[in-house]
């Protein structure tokens, strides 16, 4: 969904005013900088609160630590740690500017959390182990799709006419129209808070009494205090379930601002959207991993090292960085003039960066940023019962419920065929409960635990969708990225108090060590778009540093 142009201009001026105040600049100076680098103030937002203050608030760290003559006699040495979409797009952006880099990836393949399953299902259907959705406003991912001649499937366009989500709470259906009516009781205050308080970041200039109050309130308590009937109401239970699986942690651990900044900005249509403007509309035909594979193919083969696990990073007296890797060929040492760290903070916090020269706030963000514990159970069915008329109405494949699985969607939307691929997605304690499979990415064929979970899910789903249990074909997969050593979480999530503590600082560079990944994105946290845009941003920092030095 696209935001109102007038409202966005107002928000842009609010952001610029706060940036000017925080950095002792004039409003015109901030707007001139934004004109030179437009994404600073006008980047489309997933959660509708664009707060990329980090790059400017950390202005003291933006200076190139190496002398101006450092690269006149040799090319700069640029190391990118992590071969997910952030690292790959950083390398591609650098290559477009004529700069070479080397990616060091810990696993055996590139892609990070973007890897598809195109072989397990019938009728050439594809599912995603992790990263799945591309929104209408995800311009960076869409640009990569266009650049490499790939095709997007419009999943919303493919849904049957007049189909709706199935809402099922307290063992009864909760109509979408009733949810809209119930939402009216909280919509005005929610919209007021979202408009008046954003952005809320580590910068004290954004710390208004109510934003600080809401940041230190849990999402659970926000529901109890603001939704009539709290968790005893269908709307309260709906919001709790939806935001547990959306952010990946139980609502008693999340900042209330997660709900305010996502649900508070509704699309311009008259319909109520539980996730605000995020429409989760597209996926790539043939699998989303066609994007990282296409980028890798466009880079020199020798520029990607796989199975290189970073053990430590240290800043050298001359301003360069020394990196130590465990590799199949033993320990290897790399010296770099610039480093882009794209690995999740959940992984970085377990590595040795004590000598990297990071400041206290960066260390706090690395050590404490929350990460979701989502699990994704993918279950194929012999037909798409949910699209038929039933006691649930006419479904689009999505369930929101207080049953253990929280949420489903139809991963086969837009793909021809009779059979369907249903995804059950759960976060928080419910996600952690699916922990019996030994591998973080397992199938029913090799893991009896996955088959057990599939049966349990279908038995529960038979309540809102009678008859679904009998349509299972016996296959299933389970993704638990919080168990994967190179991920240790589904995606980042701001916990209670973390907006005001360090939100917006995750991507602030530390000398010539740059940071990228979805966890650095204030606009697209948790999305592939967040990784892609942050990779390009970190690369652009290096390009800007090196202008005139080559």
Language-model-detected regions and their locations in the chain:
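N-terminal secretory signal peptides
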Residues: 1-45
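C-terminal lid/capping helical subdomain adjacent to the catalytic/cofactor pocket in oxidative enzymes
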Residues: 6, 500-550
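N-terminal export signals
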Residues: 42, 47-70
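N-terminal glycine-rich phosphate/pyrophosphate-binding loop and immediately adjacent elements
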Residues: 72-198, 352
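Catalytic cores of eukaryotic secretory-pathway lumenal/extracellular enzymes that build
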Residues: 120, 124-127, 131-137, 141, ...
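Active-site/ligand-binding neighborhood in enzyme catalytic cores
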Residues: 204-312, 319-322, 327, 335, ...
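C-terminal segments that line or cap access tunnels to active or ligand-binding sites in enzymes
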Residues: 336, 343-488
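A glycine-rich dinucleotide-binding beta-alpha-beta segment and adjacent secondary-structure elements
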Residues: 468-520
